[in-house]
Swiss-Prot record:
The keyword Nucleotide-binding applies. The keyword Amino-acid biosynthesis does not apply. Keywords: ATP-binding, Nucleotide-binding. It comes from the Archaea. It comes from Methanocaldococcus jannaschii (strain ATCC 43067 / DSM 2661 / JAL-1 / JCM 10045 / NBRC 100440) (Methanococcus jannaschii). Pfam families: AAA_31. GO terms for cellular component: cytoplasmic side of plasma membrane; cytosol. This is Uncharacterized ATP-binding protein MJ0410. The lineage of its organism: Archaea, Methanobacteriati, Methanobacteriota, Methanomada group, Methanococci. ATP binds at I8, Q9, G10, G11, T12, G13, K14, T15. GO terms for molecular function: ATP binding; ATP hydrolysis activity.
Amino acid sequence: MKIGFYNIQGGTGKTTVAANFAYILSQSVKTILIDCDIYGGTTAVLFGLEDKEHNLNTYLAGDSAIEDIIYHYDDLAIIHTDVSSKVFGYKSDLNRFETLVKELEEEYDVIIYDFPPNITEDNPLIGYVGEFELVNKVVVVGEDSIPSIVNSLKTIELITDLGIGLTGIIVNKYRGLTDISEIIDDVIGVLPYDQNVERQWVESTPIVKIKTKFTKEMTALANEIASIYLEKDLASLRALRLAKAISELTEVEKSEKDFEDYLE
């Protein structure tokens, strides 16, 4: 299962929601988080990976192997992007991104993408439209303001036009400034504004590990989304993997028997 978090507007808290959602999921299913913002990603800061040599940028440049760029925070696997100014000097072969995803699909139950807030081809969400199924569902992360609602509506329309499945919109940083439900039909969750969220960037730990009002709502929302949208798909995925493993085992046994018959 591949879920992307996106909005054409930056600053809505998309990385916070994606990273904490992924962290919560990782406690029950094998999950990897990919920061897809090759120029402005900040996942490395959240998880304390700023000094790591290998990252998505070096992989896309052909300088790192897949196994080199995967790091772990507790049970969550993470692929981050470079947070230094070196990002502007990397050459990026986005064809390598497809190779990456196809390999990760074999290893992880859930892939979470934190997509950048742009509509250019260096955004995998846009660059791979119609080529292979990069993502199964997209969650739009907006915030409690009129400008964000406007851009969230545009984002929803864009996702629909691209033919990508829309899970809905999460309204982040809610302070009661707007009546979201009267404007947008696809709201699946509301997360409160909580100044404690900024602590995660200082402490390099996901905010859901710290007791806050945001943590309570984020955890409940993540579990609800998982129960509605993931359980059936994960059961099907595991059944397919089991069938494939049995098939491969059968082929091995058949080959061994053929070899034994040959020796006889």
